[in-house]
Design a protein with these regions (language model features):
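Non-catalytic accessory segments of hydrolases
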Residues: 3, 17-192, 213, 487-506, ...
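Classical eukaryotic N-terminal signal peptides for Sec-dependent ER targeting/secretion
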Residues: 1-13, 17
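Short, solvent-exposed turn/loop segments enriched in Gly/Ser/Thr/Pro and often Arg
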Residues: 172, 219-223, 451-459, 521-534
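Substrate-gating cap/lid region and adjacent catalytic-acid/histidine neighborhood
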Residues: 295-500
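Serine-hydrolase-like catalytic core of hydrolytic proteins
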Residues: 24, 105-286, 337-360
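A structural signal for well-ordered alpha-helical segments within the folded catalytic domains
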Residues: 60, 114-118, 193-196, 200, ...
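Short, internal active-site loops enriched in acidic
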Residues: 140-142, 222-224, 294-296, 455-459, ...
Length: 568
Protein backbone atom coordinates (compact mmCIF):
# COMPACT_ATOMS: atom_id res chain seq x y z
CA UNK A 1 0.00 0.00 0.00
CA UNK A 2 1.39 3.41 -1.02
CA UNK A 3 0.85 5.86 1.83
CA UNK A 4 0.04 9.57 1.61
CA UNK A 5 3.68 10.58 1.88
CA UNK A 6 4.43 8.63 -1.31
CA UNK A 7 1.51 9.88 -3.34
CA UNK A 8 3.52 12.59 -5.14
CA UNK A 9 6.21 10.08 -6.10
CA UNK A 10 3.70 7.49 -7.22
CA UNK A 11 2.06 10.14 -9.36
CA UNK A 12 5.35 10.65 -11.15
CA UNK A 13 5.07 7.16 -12.60
CA UNK A 14 1.57 7.83 -13.88
CA UNK A 15 2.51 11.21 -15.31
CA UNK A 16 5.53 9.76 -17.08
CA UNK A 17 3.40 7.01 -18.61
CA UNK A 18 0.63 9.35 -19.75
CA UNK A 19 3.03 11.77 -21.30
CA UNK A 20 3.89 8.90 -23.56
CA UNK A 21 6.79 10.79 -24.92
CA UNK A 22 4.85 13.18 -26.99
CA UNK A 23 7.62 15.61 -26.21
CA UNK A 24 10.08 13.51 -28.17
CA UNK A 25 8.36 14.18 -31.40
CA UNK A 26 8.41 17.77 -30.30
CA UNK A 27 12.17 18.13 -30.67
CA UNK A 28 12.98 21.72 -29.94
CA UNK A 29 14.55 23.40 -32.96
CA UNK A 30 16.23 26.77 -32.69
CA UNK A 31 14.44 29.26 -34.90
CA UNK A 32 17.55 31.34 -34.95
CA UNK A 33 21.11 31.15 -33.77
CA UNK A 34 21.10 32.10 -30.10
CA UNK A 35 23.78 34.38 -28.73
CA UNK A 36 25.95 32.44 -26.30
CA UNK A 37 24.89 32.93 -22.66
CA UNK A 38 26.79 35.38 -20.50
CA UNK A 39 26.55 35.85 -16.72
CA UNK A 40 28.47 38.26 -14.51
CA UNK A 41 29.40 37.16 -10.97
CA UNK A 42 31.49 38.73 -8.20
CA UNK A 43 34.79 37.72 -9.81
CA UNK A 44 33.91 38.91 -13.31
CA UNK A 45 31.83 37.92 -16.33
CA UNK A 46 31.51 34.37 -17.67
CA UNK A 47 30.98 33.44 -21.30
CA UNK A 48 29.12 30.13 -21.33
CA UNK A 49 27.59 28.04 -24.07
CA UNK A 50 24.34 26.30 -24.92
CA UNK A 51 23.75 22.57 -24.95
CA UNK A 52 20.52 20.71 -25.68
CA UNK A 53 18.68 18.67 -23.08
CA UNK A 54 17.21 15.28 -23.96
CA UNK A 55 14.10 16.91 -25.38
CA UNK A 56 16.12 19.23 -27.62
CA UNK A 57 15.65 22.39 -25.57
CA UNK A 58 18.65 24.60 -24.85
CA UNK A 59 20.20 24.91 -21.43
CA UNK A 60 23.11 27.06 -20.31
CA UNK A 61 26.44 25.56 -19.28
CA UNK A 62 29.27 27.44 -17.59
CA UNK A 63 32.24 25.10 -17.55
CA UNK A 64 35.54 25.23 -15.73
CA UNK A 65 34.69 28.16 -13.47
CA UNK A 66 37.50 28.78 -10.93
CA UNK A 67 36.60 28.89 -7.24
CA UNK A 68 40.14 28.91 -5.79
CA UNK A 69 43.69 29.57 -6.90
CA UNK A 70 45.46 26.64 -8.56
CA UNK A 71 46.94 24.56 -5.68
CA UNK A 72 50.35 24.23 -7.31
CA UNK A 73 53.91 25.00 -6.26
CA UNK A 74 53.95 26.52 -2.80
CA UNK A 75 50.17 26.00 -2.55
CA UNK A 76 50.47 22.21 -2.76
CA UNK A 77 49.46 20.66 0.60
CA UNK A 78 47.93 23.94 1.76
CA UNK A 79 44.39 25.09 2.39
CA UNK A 80 42.65 26.51 -0.70
CA UNK A 81 43.18 30.21 -1.39
CA UNK A 82 40.60 32.60 -2.81
CA UNK A 83 41.08 33.09 -6.55
CA UNK A 84 41.66 36.55 -8.03
CA UNK A 85 38.95 38.39 -10.00
CA UNK A 86 39.46 38.91 -13.72
CA UNK A 87 38.77 41.59 -16.30
CA UNK A 88 37.03 40.88 -19.56
CA UNK A 89 35.04 37.72 -20.17
CA UNK A 90 36.21 34.40 -18.75
CA UNK A 91 35.90 31.56 -21.26
CA UNK A 92 33.56 29.11 -19.55
CA UNK A 93 32.81 27.11 -22.69
CA UNK A 94 35.17 24.20 -22.06
CA UNK A 95 35.95 21.82 -19.21
CA UNK A 96 39.24 22.09 -17.36
CA UNK A 97 41.48 19.24 -16.28
CA UNK A 98 40.31 16.73 -13.72
CA UNK A 99 42.35 16.63 -10.52
CA UNK A 100 45.50 14.54 -10.76
CA UNK A 101 44.73 10.90 -10.03
CA UNK A 102 45.46 7.28 -10.73
CA UNK A 103 42.22 5.40 -10.46
CA UNK A 104 43.67 2.12 -9.30
CA UNK A 105 40.23 0.70 -8.51
CA UNK A 106 39.86 0.00 -12.24
CA UNK A 107 42.30 -2.18 -14.19
CA UNK A 108 44.95 -0.75 -16.49
CA UNK A 109 44.57 2.89 -15.46
CA UNK A 110 47.23 5.53 -16.01
CA UNK A 111 47.72 8.87 -14.29
CA UNK A 112 45.20 11.45 -15.49
CA UNK A 113 44.58 15.13 -14.87
CA UNK A 114 46.64 17.89 -13.32
CA UNK A 115 47.09 19.76 -10.08
CA UNK A 116 45.48 22.92 -11.49
CA UNK A 117 41.96 21.56 -11.14
CA UNK A 118 39.84 23.59 -8.72
CA UNK A 119 36.99 24.37 -11.08
CA UNK A 120 33.26 23.78 -11.11
CA UNK A 121 30.49 23.56 -13.69
CA UNK A 122 27.14 25.34 -13.46
CA UNK A 123 24.08 24.32 -15.48
CA UNK A 124 20.76 26.12 -15.65
CA UNK A 125 17.65 25.86 -17.84
CA UNK A 126 17.22 28.65 -20.37
CA UNK A 127 14.42 31.20 -19.97
CA UNK A 128 13.21 29.93 -16.62
CA UNK A 129 12.39 32.49 -14.01
CA UNK A 130 14.03 32.00 -10.64
CA UNK A 131 15.04 31.75 -8.04
CA UNK A 132 15.47 28.00 -8.52
CA UNK A 133 16.67 25.47 -5.95
CA UNK A 134 20.26 24.33 -6.41
CA UNK A 135 21.68 20.80 -6.37
CA UNK A 136 25.38 20.81 -5.47
CA UNK A 137 26.64 17.35 -6.41
CA UNK A 138 29.93 15.94 -5.05
CA UNK A 139 31.42 13.09 -7.06
CA UNK A 140 32.67 9.87 -5.52
CA UNK A 141 35.76 7.80 -6.20
CA UNK A 142 37.16 6.72 -2.80
CA UNK A 143 38.83 10.15 -2.51
CA UNK A 144 41.39 8.96 -5.07
CA UNK A 145 39.57 9.45 -8.38
CA UNK A 146 36.68 11.14 -10.14
CA UNK A 147 35.78 14.47 -11.71
CA UNK A 148 32.88 16.74 -12.61
CA UNK A 149 33.17 15.79 -16.29
CA UNK A 150 30.04 16.06 -18.43
CA UNK A 151 30.92 12.64 -19.85
CA UNK A 152 30.31 11.16 -16.39
CA UNK A 153 27.82 13.62 -14.91
CA UNK A 154 25.87 14.98 -17.84
CA UNK A 155 23.19 17.38 -16.52
CA UNK A 156 20.60 16.75 -19.22
CA UNK A 157 18.10 14.84 -17.08
CA UNK A 158 18.05 17.55 -14.43
CA UNK A 159 17.84 20.23 -17.12
CA UNK A 160 14.87 18.37 -18.64
CA UNK A 161 12.88 19.18 -15.51
CA UNK A 162 13.60 22.91 -15.91
CA UNK A 163 13.23 23.17 -12.13
CA UNK A 164 16.75 23.23 -10.68
CA UNK A 165 20.26 24.54 -11.16
CA UNK A 166 23.08 22.00 -10.96
CA UNK A 167 26.60 22.72 -9.65
CA UNK A 168 29.35 20.08 -9.92
CA UNK A 169 32.71 20.92 -8.28
CA UNK A 170 36.08 19.20 -8.41
CA UNK A 171 38.37 18.73 -5.44
CA UNK A 172 41.90 17.52 -4.78
CA UNK A 173 42.30 13.77 -4.48
CA UNK A 174 44.57 11.15 -2.90
CA UNK A 175 47.91 12.47 -1.65
CA UNK A 176 47.21 15.95 -3.07
CA UNK A 177 43.88 16.24 -1.25
CA UNK A 178 44.43 14.38 2.00
CA UNK A 179 48.11 14.26 2.96
CA UNK A 180 48.39 14.97 6.67
CA UNK A 181 51.17 15.12 9.23
CA UNK A 182 48.51 15.61 11.91
CA UNK A 183 50.03 18.94 12.89
CA UNK A 184 50.54 22.45 11.56
CA UNK A 185 52.96 21.36 8.81
CA UNK A 186 50.12 19.75 6.84
CA UNK A 187 46.81 19.52 8.72
CA UNK A 188 45.08 17.75 5.80
CA UNK A 189 41.46 17.65 4.60
CA UNK A 190 42.35 19.74 1.54
CA UNK A 191 39.84 17.93 -0.65
CA UNK A 192 37.03 18.63 1.82
CA UNK A 193 38.18 22.24 2.15
CA UNK A 194 38.08 22.56 -1.64
CA UNK A 195 34.44 21.45 -1.51
CA UNK A 196 33.87 24.00 1.25
CA UNK A 197 35.31 26.72 -0.97
CA UNK A 198 33.01 25.63 -3.80
CA UNK A 199 30.03 25.79 -1.43
CA UNK A 200 31.01 29.31 -0.39
CA UNK A 201 31.37 30.24 -4.05
CA UNK A 202 27.86 28.92 -4.62
CA UNK A 203 26.45 31.02 -1.79
CA UNK A 204 28.13 34.16 -3.14
CA UNK A 205 27.29 33.70 -6.79
CA UNK A 206 24.40 31.36 -7.48
CA UNK A 207 21.84 34.17 -7.38
CA UNK A 208 23.50 35.62 -10.50
CA UNK A 209 22.47 32.42 -12.30
CA UNK A 210 18.91 32.58 -11.00
CA UNK A 211 19.55 30.17 -8.15
CA UNK A 212 18.28 30.44 -4.59
CA UNK A 213 21.20 30.44 -2.10
CA UNK A 214 18.72 29.55 0.65
CA UNK A 215 17.74 26.33 -1.14
CA UNK A 216 21.04 24.57 -1.80
CA UNK A 217 20.94 20.77 -1.56
CA UNK A 218 24.31 19.08 -1.16
CA UNK A 219 24.28 15.57 -2.57
CA UNK A 220 27.04 13.05 -3.08
CA UNK A 221 27.73 9.43 -3.88
CA UNK A 222 30.30 7.12 -2.23
CA UNK A 223 33.19 9.37 -1.14
CA UNK A 224 30.91 12.26 -2.09
CA UNK A 225 28.32 10.81 0.28
CA UNK A 226 30.86 10.71 3.09
CA UNK A 227 31.77 14.29 2.18
CA UNK A 228 28.15 15.38 2.60
CA UNK A 229 28.06 13.92 6.10
CA UNK A 230 31.39 15.57 6.93
CA UNK A 231 29.98 18.93 5.83
CA UNK A 232 27.00 18.44 8.12
CA UNK A 233 29.46 18.12 11.02
CA UNK A 234 32.01 20.81 10.16
CA UNK A 235 31.41 24.17 11.85
CA UNK A 236 32.78 25.82 8.70
CA UNK A 237 29.79 24.86 6.56
CA UNK A 238 26.90 26.00 8.75
CA UNK A 239 24.37 27.93 6.70
CA UNK A 240 25.85 26.98 3.32
CA UNK A 241 23.14 24.43 2.44
CA UNK A 242 19.55 23.60 3.38
CA UNK A 243 19.18 19.89 2.56
CA UNK A 244 21.55 16.93 2.30
CA UNK A 245 21.58 13.63 0.42
CA UNK A 246 24.10 10.82 1.01
CA UNK A 247 24.24 7.87 -1.38
CA UNK A 248 26.29 4.76 -0.62
CA UNK A 249 28.81 6.12 1.82
CA UNK A 250 29.28 7.32 5.40
CA UNK A 251 31.72 9.42 7.38
CA UNK A 252 31.50 6.72 10.07
CA UNK A 253 33.08 4.03 7.89
CA UNK A 254 36.11 2.21 9.30
CA UNK A 255 38.19 3.34 6.36
CA UNK A 256 38.33 6.86 7.79
CA UNK A 257 39.97 5.64 10.99
CA UNK A 258 42.23 2.65 10.26
CA UNK A 259 45.26 4.55 8.90
CA UNK A 260 48.03 6.30 10.84
CA UNK A 261 48.14 9.52 8.79
CA UNK A 262 51.67 10.60 9.74
CA UNK A 263 53.07 7.11 9.16
CA UNK A 264 51.39 7.06 5.74
CA UNK A 265 52.94 10.44 4.89
CA UNK A 266 56.40 9.16 5.82
CA UNK A 267 55.80 6.03 3.77
CA UNK A 268 54.71 8.21 0.84
CA UNK A 269 57.99 10.11 1.08
CA UNK A 270 59.97 6.87 1.13
CA UNK A 271 58.36 5.43 -2.01
CA UNK A 272 59.21 8.56 -4.03
CA UNK A 273 62.82 8.39 -2.92
CA UNK A 274 63.07 11.02 -0.18
CA UNK A 275 66.07 10.11 1.96
CA UNK A 276 65.72 9.66 5.72
CA UNK A 277 61.96 10.17 5.55
CA UNK A 278 61.49 8.67 8.99
CA UNK A 279 63.99 11.12 10.52
CA UNK A 280 62.75 14.39 9.03
CA UNK A 281 60.63 16.84 10.98
CA UNK A 282 57.10 17.19 9.69
CA UNK A 283 57.95 20.61 8.22
CA UNK A 284 60.95 19.17 6.37
CA UNK A 285 58.90 16.20 5.23
CA UNK A 286 56.20 18.36 3.64
CA UNK A 287 58.74 20.70 2.03
CA UNK A 288 60.47 17.72 0.42
CA UNK A 289 57.16 16.37 -0.85
CA UNK A 290 56.28 19.75 -2.37
CA UNK A 291 59.34 19.39 -4.60
CA UNK A 292 58.39 15.98 -5.98
CA UNK A 293 56.98 15.90 -9.51
CA UNK A 294 53.19 15.56 -9.38
CA UNK A 295 53.15 12.73 -11.90
CA UNK A 296 55.56 10.74 -9.76
CA UNK A 297 53.48 11.37 -6.64
CA UNK A 298 50.29 10.23 -8.35
CA UNK A 299 51.90 7.17 -9.89
CA UNK A 300 53.43 6.07 -6.59
CA UNK A 301 50.06 5.09 -5.11
CA UNK A 302 50.70 1.56 -6.38
CA UNK A 303 53.71 1.28 -4.06
CA UNK A 304 51.51 1.92 -1.02
CA UNK A 305 49.30 -1.11 -1.59
CA UNK A 306 49.44 -4.51 0.05
CA UNK A 307 47.36 -6.55 -2.40
CA UNK A 308 46.28 -5.32 -5.82
CA UNK A 309 44.49 -2.02 -5.05
CA UNK A 310 44.00 -2.73 -1.37
CA UNK A 311 43.73 -0.97 0.94
CA UNK A 312 41.78 1.28 -1.45
CA UNK A 313 40.97 3.98 1.05
CA UNK A 314 44.39 5.13 2.24
CA UNK A 315 43.96 8.88 1.77
CA UNK A 316 41.11 10.04 3.96
CA UNK A 317 39.78 12.81 6.16
CA UNK A 318 41.69 13.76 9.30
CA UNK A 319 40.79 15.08 12.73
CA UNK A 320 42.88 18.27 12.72
CA UNK A 321 44.91 18.59 15.89
CA UNK A 322 46.25 22.00 14.88
CA UNK A 323 43.28 24.32 15.31
CA UNK A 324 42.95 27.78 13.78
CA UNK A 325 40.31 29.76 11.89
CA UNK A 326 40.70 27.51 8.82
CA UNK A 327 40.34 24.19 10.66
CA UNK A 328 37.71 22.07 8.97
CA UNK A 329 37.19 19.43 11.66
CA UNK A 330 38.91 19.27 15.04
CA UNK A 331 36.72 16.63 16.69
CA UNK A 332 36.20 12.96 15.93
CA UNK A 333 33.25 12.64 13.48
CA UNK A 334 32.07 9.51 15.29
CA UNK A 335 31.66 11.49 18.50
CA UNK A 336 30.07 14.45 16.72
CA UNK A 337 27.49 12.31 14.94
CA UNK A 338 26.51 10.18 17.91
CA UNK A 339 26.07 13.27 20.09
CA UNK A 340 24.02 15.08 17.45
CA UNK A 341 26.57 17.86 17.07
CA UNK A 342 25.88 18.54 13.40
CA UNK A 343 23.88 20.89 11.18
CA UNK A 344 20.21 19.82 11.47
CA UNK A 345 18.94 19.89 7.90
CA UNK A 346 16.53 17.46 6.22
CA UNK A 347 18.65 14.43 5.39
CA UNK A 348 18.11 11.63 2.86
CA UNK A 349 20.26 8.50 2.92
CA UNK A 350 20.42 5.95 0.09
CA UNK A 351 21.93 2.52 -0.42
CA UNK A 352 21.98 -0.25 -3.04
CA UNK A 353 21.83 -4.03 -3.04
CA UNK A 354 25.40 -5.03 -3.96
CA UNK A 355 27.52 -2.09 -2.84
CA UNK A 356 30.52 -4.36 -2.27
CA UNK A 357 30.90 -5.12 -5.96
CA UNK A 358 33.03 -1.98 -6.20
CA UNK A 359 35.92 -3.93 -4.67
CA UNK A 360 34.97 -7.55 -5.26
CA UNK A 361 33.82 -7.63 -8.89
CA UNK A 362 37.27 -7.00 -10.35
CA UNK A 363 38.79 -9.75 -8.21
CA UNK A 364 35.98 -12.17 -9.02
CA UNK A 365 36.48 -11.43 -12.73
CA UNK A 366 40.21 -12.14 -12.64
CA UNK A 367 41.25 -15.71 -11.86
CA UNK A 368 44.87 -14.70 -11.24
CA UNK A 369 43.87 -12.10 -8.61
CA UNK A 370 41.42 -14.51 -7.08
CA UNK A 371 44.08 -17.18 -6.68
CA UNK A 372 46.53 -14.68 -5.20
CA UNK A 373 43.92 -13.58 -2.67
CA UNK A 374 43.11 -17.16 -1.79
CA UNK A 375 46.78 -18.02 -1.29
CA UNK A 376 46.97 -15.23 1.30
CA UNK A 377 43.43 -15.47 2.66
CA UNK A 378 44.23 -14.75 6.30
CA UNK A 379 46.03 -11.52 5.40
CA UNK A 380 44.24 -10.20 2.31
CA UNK A 381 40.55 -10.92 2.89
CA UNK A 382 40.30 -9.22 6.32
CA UNK A 383 42.33 -6.30 4.92
CA UNK A 384 39.49 -5.36 2.57
CA UNK A 385 37.07 -4.78 5.46
CA UNK A 386 39.58 -3.38 7.93
CA UNK A 387 39.62 -6.40 10.25
CA UNK A 388 43.00 -6.83 11.92
CA UNK A 389 42.22 -8.23 15.37
CA UNK A 390 42.71 -12.03 15.53
CA UNK A 391 39.18 -12.52 16.82
CA UNK A 392 37.79 -10.41 13.97
CA UNK A 393 39.64 -12.55 11.46
CA UNK A 394 38.10 -15.67 12.99
CA UNK A 395 34.65 -14.07 12.92
CA UNK A 396 34.96 -13.36 9.19
CA UNK A 397 36.12 -16.88 8.41
CA UNK A 398 33.32 -18.49 10.41
CA UNK A 399 30.56 -16.29 9.01
CA UNK A 400 31.41 -16.03 5.32
CA UNK A 401 33.85 -18.83 4.47
CA UNK A 402 33.14 -21.75 6.84
CA UNK A 403 33.72 -24.37 4.13
CA UNK A 404 37.18 -23.07 3.24
CA UNK A 405 40.41 -24.34 4.75
CA UNK A 406 42.30 -22.34 7.36
CA UNK A 407 44.87 -21.30 4.74
CA UNK A 408 42.61 -20.93 1.67
CA UNK A 409 39.21 -19.53 2.58
CA UNK A 410 37.64 -19.28 -0.86
CA UNK A 411 35.79 -22.09 -2.59
CA UNK A 412 33.62 -22.03 -5.70
CA UNK A 413 30.58 -22.34 -3.46
CA UNK A 414 31.37 -19.41 -1.15
CA UNK A 415 32.67 -16.91 -3.73
CA UNK A 416 29.41 -14.88 -3.61
CA UNK A 417 30.06 -14.34 0.09
CA UNK A 418 33.10 -12.22 -0.75
CA UNK A 419 30.84 -9.58 -2.28
CA UNK A 420 28.37 -9.95 0.59
CA UNK A 421 31.16 -9.42 3.14
CA UNK A 422 32.36 -6.25 1.42
CA UNK A 423 28.82 -4.92 1.01
CA UNK A 424 28.07 -5.37 4.71
CA UNK A 425 31.43 -4.33 6.18
CA UNK A 426 32.56 -1.50 3.93
CA UNK A 427 29.14 0.03 3.28
CA UNK A 428 26.04 -1.21 5.11
CA UNK A 429 27.35 -1.14 8.67
CA UNK A 430 28.41 2.51 8.67
CA UNK A 431 25.39 3.68 6.63
CA UNK A 432 22.97 1.95 8.99
CA UNK A 433 24.92 3.27 11.98
CA UNK A 434 24.53 6.77 10.56
CA UNK A 435 20.77 6.27 10.39
CA UNK A 436 20.37 4.56 13.76
CA UNK A 437 22.37 7.15 15.68
CA UNK A 438 20.50 9.98 14.01
CA UNK A 439 17.00 8.74 14.80
CA UNK A 440 18.02 7.78 18.35
CA UNK A 441 18.70 11.41 19.27
CA UNK A 442 15.99 12.80 21.52
CA UNK A 443 17.08 16.32 20.58
CA UNK A 444 16.72 15.65 16.86
CA UNK A 445 14.64 18.28 15.06
CA UNK A 446 15.28 17.59 11.36
CA UNK A 447 13.60 14.85 9.30
CA UNK A 448 15.42 11.84 7.87
CA UNK A 449 14.37 9.52 5.05
CA UNK A 450 15.99 6.44 3.52
CA UNK A 451 15.76 4.99 0.02
CA UNK A 452 16.89 1.65 -1.38
CA UNK A 453 17.77 1.51 -5.07
CA UNK A 454 16.96 -1.98 -6.31
CA UNK A 455 16.22 -1.51 -10.01
CA UNK A 456 17.82 -3.80 -12.58
CA UNK A 457 18.51 -2.30 -16.00
CA UNK A 458 20.48 -3.36 -19.09
CA UNK A 459 23.60 -1.45 -18.04
CA UNK A 460 25.72 -1.53 -14.91
CA UNK A 461 28.77 0.15 -13.43
CA UNK A 462 30.24 -3.34 -13.04
CA UNK A 463 30.62 -3.51 -16.82
CA UNK A 464 32.73 -0.36 -16.72
CA UNK A 465 34.69 -1.48 -13.65
CA UNK A 466 35.59 -4.96 -14.87
CA UNK A 467 35.51 -4.47 -18.66
CA UNK A 468 33.29 -7.57 -18.75
CA UNK A 469 29.58 -8.24 -18.90
CA UNK A 470 29.59 -10.34 -15.76
CA UNK A 471 26.38 -10.11 -13.77
CA UNK A 472 27.09 -8.73 -10.30
CA UNK A 473 23.55 -7.53 -9.69
CA UNK A 474 22.69 -3.94 -8.79
CA UNK A 475 26.06 -2.53 -7.85
CA UNK A 476 27.72 0.48 -6.26
CA UNK A 477 27.03 3.63 -8.31
CA UNK A 478 24.40 2.05 -10.58
CA UNK A 479 21.91 4.75 -9.59
CA UNK A 480 24.19 7.36 -11.18
CA UNK A 481 23.38 5.87 -14.60
CA UNK A 482 19.81 7.12 -14.05
CA UNK A 483 20.53 10.48 -12.44
CA UNK A 484 23.06 11.65 -15.00
CA UNK A 485 23.61 11.23 -18.69
CA UNK A 486 26.77 9.16 -19.04
CA UNK A 487 27.92 9.73 -22.60
CA UNK A 488 31.24 8.09 -21.80
CA UNK A 489 29.64 4.95 -20.41
CA UNK A 490 26.19 3.98 -21.72
CA UNK A 491 23.97 5.06 -24.63
CA UNK A 492 20.94 7.29 -24.15
CA UNK A 493 17.86 5.41 -23.02
CA UNK A 494 15.09 4.71 -25.48
CA UNK A 495 12.13 6.91 -24.79
CA UNK A 496 9.35 4.97 -23.09
CA UNK A 497 11.62 2.11 -22.01
CA UNK A 498 11.69 0.94 -18.37
CA UNK A 499 15.12 2.52 -17.85
CA UNK A 500 13.85 5.82 -19.26
CA UNK A 501 11.01 5.80 -16.71
CA UNK A 502 13.42 4.88 -13.91
CA UNK A 503 15.68 7.80 -14.79
CA UNK A 504 12.78 10.23 -14.88
CA UNK A 505 11.35 9.05 -11.57
CA UNK A 506 14.69 9.14 -9.75
CA UNK A 507 15.56 12.61 -11.05
CA UNK A 508 12.11 13.89 -10.05
CA UNK A 509 12.68 12.38 -6.60
CA UNK A 510 15.85 14.44 -6.22
CA UNK A 511 14.15 17.57 -7.51
CA UNK A 512 11.38 17.01 -4.96
CA UNK A 513 14.05 16.85 -2.23
CA UNK A 514 15.57 20.10 -3.52
CA UNK A 515 12.19 21.83 -3.21
CA UNK A 516 10.75 20.22 -0.09
CA UNK A 517 13.63 18.76 1.90
CA UNK A 518 12.29 15.20 2.09
CA UNK A 519 10.54 13.17 -0.62
CA UNK A 520 9.99 9.78 1.01
CA UNK A 521 8.66 8.27 4.24
CA UNK A 522 10.13 9.57 7.48
CA UNK A 523 12.53 7.32 9.35
CA UNK A 524 12.11 7.43 13.13
CA UNK A 525 13.32 5.41 16.09
CA UNK A 526 9.90 3.72 16.23
CA UNK A 527 9.57 2.94 12.53
CA UNK A 528 12.00 3.22 9.65
CA UNK A 529 10.58 2.18 6.32
CA UNK A 530 12.77 2.43 3.23
CA UNK A 531 11.43 3.68 -0.08
CA UNK A 532 12.44 1.03 -2.60
CA UNK A 533 12.87 1.78 -6.30
CA UNK A 534 12.55 -1.53 -8.12
CA UNK A 535 11.28 -3.27 -11.25
CA UNK A 536 7.61 -3.91 -11.87
CA UNK A 537 5.95 -6.66 -13.91
CA UNK A 538 3.35 -4.16 -15.10
CA UNK A 539 4.43 -2.93 -18.56
CA UNK A 540 2.37 0.22 -18.10
CA UNK A 541 4.16 1.02 -14.84
CA UNK A 542 7.64 -0.52 -15.25
CA UNK A 543 8.99 1.03 -12.05
CA UNK A 544 7.59 0.06 -8.66
CA UNK A 545 7.81 2.20 -5.54
CA UNK A 546 7.55 -0.04 -2.51
CA UNK A 547 8.04 0.28 1.22
CA UNK A 548 10.32 -2.17 3.00
CA UNK A 549 10.86 -2.46 6.72
CA UNK A 550 14.08 -1.55 8.47
CA UNK A 551 17.40 -3.34 8.41
CA UNK A 552 18.96 -6.70 9.13
CA UNK A 553 19.61 -6.29 12.85
CA UNK A 554 21.60 -9.52 13.19
CA UNK A 555 23.95 -8.43 10.41
CA UNK A 556 24.41 -4.99 11.96
CA UNK A 557 25.15 -6.47 15.39
CA UNK A 558 27.79 -8.79 13.93
CA UNK A 559 29.71 -5.92 12.34
CA UNK A 560 29.25 -3.72 15.38
CA UNK A 561 30.98 -6.36 17.50
CA UNK A 562 33.70 -6.93 14.91
CA UNK A 563 34.58 -3.25 14.55
CA UNK A 564 34.46 -2.72 18.31
CA UNK A 565 37.47 -5.04 18.48
CA UNK A 566 39.31 -2.65 16.14
CA UNK A 567 38.18 0.37 18.19
CA UNK A 568 36.68 1.98 15.08
Amino acid sequence: MIGPTLAPLFALVIVAVHRGLAAIGDQFAFDQVLPEPRTCIQDGCLQGRYYSDLEGRPYEAYLGVPFAKPPVGRLRFRNPVQNDPWSGDYDATWERSRCMQKNDVKPQQTVQGGEDCLYLNVYRPRNVTGPLPVIFFIHGGAFISGSSSMAEFGPERFMDTRKVILVTPQYRLAVFGFLSTEDRASPGNYGLKDQLFALRWTQRNIAYFGGDPKLVTIAGQSAGSSSVQHHMMSPQTRGLFARAVSMSGSALGFWHYDVDKLALTRRQAEVVGIANATELTTEQLVEELREVDGLELARSIDKLKVFYVHPVTLWQSTVERYVDEDTYMSEDPRVLWESGNYYPVPYTVGLLDNEGSLYSSIILSNRSLLNEMNDHSVEYIPLIVGAYHPTSVEMLKDRFFPDGSDERWLTEENLPNLQKMVTEGVFYHSIIKTIKQSVALKSRTSPLSVFYFNFTGPYSQSYLDTYTYGDFGIVHADELLYLFRSSGGVPDYQVGSPVWYMAKILVDYYVDIAYNGIAGPLCTAESCQLLEFTNSDNPNKPVALDLIDGFDEEMFTFWDKLYALQNY
